[in-house]
Amino acid sequence: SIFYCEYQNICVTLHQIRAFMNITLTYQRRQTTTTHVGGLSIGSKFPVRIQTMANTSTNNIEDSVTQAKHCVAAGSELLRFTTQGMREVESLALIHQALDGMVPLVADIHFQSDVADAAAQVVEKVRINPGNYIDPARKFKQIDYTEEEYQAELERLRNRFVLLINICKEHKT
């Protein structure tokens, strides 16, 4: 049967992925440990999980909640929202509240580590790109570092990242 909804392309794709995943393949999974995103267990003996990304504006609460419900009905087990700033974090908190635990939410963050810190307090998972995690100016220029400068930059990233990890631990993100 075909699941029809306003977001049909997303839903059909999720069903196709689910059907494909149920086929026995010769693929051997690597041994991993279990991690949890909300009430969802990932890794080790658990199946590969279906995640999709909302294409609504995160600040449009009503459309985002509607799309999330459609995606869950189609088989999505995790739902990612773009989170550009603090306004989107506030919107994610409202979306999370409206969905009432229906699906774990993921904040997709680039460039703004302070936004990641705030999002980690309202959703089940935060996705960052370490390559642009602390680059708020979005300067994609090539820089030739000395070994000392390179190590200092790594230490700066490490220190900032540890702060996020501690927030995630505190909030079980």
Residue spans for each PLM region:
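Short, positively charged and aromatic/hydrophobic N-terminal segments
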Residues: 2-13
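Glycine-rich, proline-tolerant flexible connector loops at the mouths of alpha/beta enzymes
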Residues: 55, 73-99, 130-141, 145-149
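Active-site mouth loops of central-metabolism enzymes
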Residues: 45-63, 82, 105-111
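Alpha-helix-loop-beta-strand connector modules within alpha/beta enzyme cores
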Residues: 87-107, 156-172
